[in-house]
Curated annotation (Swiss-Prot):
The gene is rnpA. Consists of a catalytic RNA component (M1 or rnpB) and a protein subunit. GO terms for biological process: tRNA 5'-leader removal. It comes from Bacillus cereus (strain B4264). Disulfide bonds: none annotated. It comes from the Bacteria. It catalyses: Endonucleolytic cleavage of RNA, removing 5'-extranucleotides from tRNA precursor. SUPFAM superfamilies: Ribosomal protein S5 domain 2-like. RNaseP catalyzes the removal of the 5'-leader sequence from pre-tRNA to produce the mature 5'-terminus. It can also cleave other RNA substrates such as 4.5S RNA. The protein component plays an auxiliary but essential role in vivo by binding to the 5'-leader sequence and broadening the substrate specificity of the ribozyme. Gene3D superfamilies: 3.30.230.10. This is Ribonuclease P protein component. Belongs to the RnpA family. Its EC number is 3.1.26.5.
Length: 115
């Protein structure tokens, strides 16, 4: 993911948590916050230390980043998202991760997701 699509700072994460809306499925929780003034969407990832070791957590983050890269044309701009991975995604394949992300984005009311 390019820098313009990342949330890195703690206060930006906290703003999305406190002011945003959340949607979830068994694998992911997605918080979203509307920010009409920004031209792009931004994504922040969080994988708890309760989920496996560092290798497993980094693998999950890589798969989520790749799925977001493939779906970036279908994700609405002007929003901040924080994606929190849950334990079941530790055993998932890339295709399952992508399908699960599409499902949770659809539940959050994003009209541009078509798949």
């Amino acid at each position: 993911m390019k820098k313009k699509h990342r949330i890195k700072k703690n206060d930006e994460f906290q703003a999305v948590f406190q002011k945003g809306k959340s949607n979830a499925n068994r694998q992911f929780v997605v918080y979203q916050l509307d920010k009409e003034e920004q031209p792009n969407f931004r994504i922040g990832l969080s994988v708890s230390k309760k989920i496996g070791n560092a290798v497993v957590r980094n693998r999950i983050k890589r798969m989520v980043r790749q799925a977001i890269t493939e779906l970036k044309d279908e994700i609405a701009s002007g929003k901040d998202f924080v994606i929190i991975a849950r334990k079941p995604c530790a055993e998932m394949t890339y295709e399952e991760v992508k399908k699960s992300l599409i499902h949770v984005f659809k539940r959050s009311g994003m009209k541009r997701i078509k798949k």
